[in-house]
A protein has these predicted regions:
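Short strand-coil-strand connectors
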Residues: 26, 62-66, 89
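Short, conserved beta-strand element in jelly-roll/cupin
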Residues: 34-36, 46-61
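Ligand-binding loop in jelly-roll beta-barrel domains
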Residues: 80-101
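A short, N-terminal "cap"/entry segment at the start of jelly-roll beta-barrel domains
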Residues: 1-31
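Conserved short histidine dyad/triad with adjacent acidic residue
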Residues: 29-46, 80-81
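Short acidic-glycine-tyrosine-enriched beta hairpin
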Residues: 65-80
Length: 101
């Protein structure tokens, strides 16, 4: 079975973030993101809910004006059509993204 490879996120505003898509099915996509220290995904929104699970490391997560620390074992749901962001400071982080398309 082929294994997906890590690749830089092609989205403008993403700095030092690699991703790999694990699964895409009707209504569902699973991906992992790997953040280096000082990495960021700029503020953006999506027309669907996204569950974000921190698997390893630590960083920060926001929804609109709410900013929270984000560390291994924590999760948050980004509501549809709300501005959100993920980033790191001194440490790296790996997240699982569960997109309900």
């Amino acid at each position: 079975m082929p294994r997906p490879d890590w690749a830089p996120l092609p989205r403008p505003g993403c700095v030092n973030v690699d991703g790999k898509v694990l699964l895409v099915r009707e209504g569902l996509a699973l991906a992992m993101l790997r953040f280096e220290p000082e990495a960021t995904i700029d503020e953006h929104s999506a027309p669907y809910e996204v569950d974000v699970i921190c698997l390893e490391g630590e960083g920060f997560i926001s929804v609109e004006d709410r900013v929270n620390s984000f560390a291994a074992g924590q999760w948050m749901t980004w509501p549809a059509d709300r501005v959100h962001r993920l980033w790191t400071a001194d440490h790296g982080m790996i997240t699982m993204m569960v997109e309900r398309l």
